[in-house]
Amino acid sequence: MFHCIPLWRCNRHVETIDKRHCSLVYVPEEIYRYARSLEELLLDANQLRELPEQFFQLVKLRKLGLSDNEIQRLPPEIANFMQLVELDVSRNDIPEIPESISFCKALQIADFSGNPLTRLPESFPELQNLTCLSVNDISLQSLPENIGNLIYTACFQNKMPL
């Protein structure tokens, strides 16, 4: 005879999920059941095109890897990730970063390389904890002044003067 395990006995405390190179075309639903504990989510090298509204309920995230996908839009709900320390959205199809990214006050490392960006948001200097910014292979016209406390900026092969 089989018995269902009560929901309260299930392990809902998962801090890291690694779904890199899994040929995903959408964010798996099972990820959301760990919204209260998930701190690191790696979805790099898939075929994701969009991030659903529910995705931005993962408010405990500290590290988010979305590189090498086909994401076409970074929604303003990115502001929900106020504890995010590291963001990698390199090599996607993101044409602009929303102004609301300024709410990600804990952000220290950001990689926007390989996207069709021409500018960074006006609010970008509000990211005072930002120490590493990678913007390789994009067509930025200029970098905003006073961007965080940058220690390292990777701007190689850009079409802008350094």
Question: How does the language model describe each region?
Answer:
Residues 1-162:
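The feature captures the LRR N-terminal capping module
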